[in-house]
């Protein structure tokens, strides 16, 4: 079987159907075909239909702009669908109430209002005892996602879209930068333009950082009240859970967020988690009838933002990775992608979501995907020795989580005057581990644009870090993104994470409780955790016991250049640790780096002292030499300290 169309869309969920409908509305004679693996498995079914950019607390930037633009279109968009099909979509711009259990740090958004404990309970009686207030987001709303997808499917068919159900795409055939055909279990399909909109399954066809995030959900039946139809009248978006009342008396409870690959089915643990969170938010629902529960796979990406725009071939367009916002972003995605296909019109909204954003840089790319070696080769720098030798003459290698390194100096990538200076400094230092702030790289923060691609990751081991995370939950989420970022850059087996949980914005001191909590979870998930901590011997021991690969006590506050102010505690940590000890933060001079190594530290991590030096490249070399000298001195053993002088030459048998 061979079928030819003007546009072939791979994926029959809400995004694929929305694009198909938009194309046909703009150009009726266009031949559009949609290939759907299994309509029932679409991520659209594993959703609650919330239109909630403010309740989701999406940070200001391109993603929020995209979400707001889509929400603004929603009323007109669903009205058009309802007119086409005569079907309801359940669209309701009802506003969303966001109860909280802890006092907020600042305003949620300019369009949102804070409600104190008394006021929020007036708005919605029956909230749990732990609720201390909440935000009212008047512009957010909801839609019945199942009704919406059914209406889209009906609209597509009525407009003449050919929907091929039960078709599994096996490969995308390419030649000379063009897709020539899509190969499936039911034959080949050809078209002038192709759209990849198959969510989590995209990575099976192209090497894209899209992965399944399992979500479990359930529905309860609300009892009808005497004076009001149902006891819960408002959408509640609480901490880690949401409750969405439908007009037919159902209450949608969601959702878990689990990176368990393709593990199917609802689980007792998942349902227990849902119920526990929901009952804490609204206790009365603990007595309501369970009507249904289900699960599905949301398409996640390393930065939790979609891929929109041209793919690796000129006639292939991507519309994938919408994660938690597929329902919300359907109208704007359909508009942007249809404009791209029909008019080659690239909206400013789409630029930040280019599929190339993880792979492009204004600097010459040095990205390599060659296999990583078990022992990293020494960087070519004739000024530095490869590694110290112990008394038996064998190489003295640094070993972390089973991986061996010649260099004991780790460096960072921030604060450099330019990307070129950073590249030259890394090379000059002789280091083999470079830490990268996941959040800043993913958001292209100032000074971090193109940073991930500026380093040859075939010779440098990436150490993703969770800088900027104030809670354990944040750090765990960012660690997972860091692992995916490392995979994308060719280090498929990189499970390292430098764990930073820092709520203190003045002194940047790490939170010991949050660090321990995050470390325990990340170790369970298979990470090699390198935790940044205060020089606390008891905490260091506890982190070692939960399975951390190293401990990284600070010498003094980050970026202070104060040197090692807590040598006694670091010495205790070194004496008792059975994992490598890395002195991290505060080192300002090569002599201080050597001091840490002479104390018996296994490695040092130095960034600011190099990046902020008058000559960073020369300082990087000096730090590398000092690290080697300090290690060699430690292995050699210093002379005993004596109370009295002892001349180097004998005092007897002198001439004359």
From Swiss-Prot:
Q: Which residues bind glycine?
A: 56, 298, 324
Q: Where does FAD bind?
A: 7-21, 48-50, 169, 322-328
Recite the UniProt keywords alphabetically.
Answer: Cytoplasm, FAD, Flavoprotein, Multifunctional enzyme, Oxidoreductase, Schiff base, Thiamine biosynthesis, Transferase
Q: Which GO terms describe its cellular component?
A: 2-iminoacetate synthase complex; cytoplasm
| InterPro entries referenced in this protein's UniProt entry, alphabetically | Aldolase_TIM, FAD-dep_OxRdtase, FAD/NAD-bd_sf, Gly_oxidase_ThiO, Thiazole_synthase_ThiG, ThiG
Q: In which pathway does it act?
A: Cofactor biosynthesis; thiamine diphosphate biosynthesis
Q: Where in the cell is it found?
A: Cytoplasm
Q: What does this protein do?
A: Catalyzes the FAD-dependent oxidative deamination of glycine. Is essential for thiamine biosynthesis since the oxidation of glycine catalyzed by ThiO generates the glycine imine intermediate (dehydroglycine) required for the biosynthesis of the thiazole ring of thiamine pyrophosphate.
Q: What name does UniProt use for this protein?
A: Bifunctional protein ThiO/ThiG
The species is Synechocystis sp. (strain ATCC 27184 / PCC 6803 / Kazusa)
Lineage here is: Bacteria, Bacillati, Cyanobacteriota, Cyanophyceae, Synechococcales
Which gene underlies this protein?
A: thiO/thiG
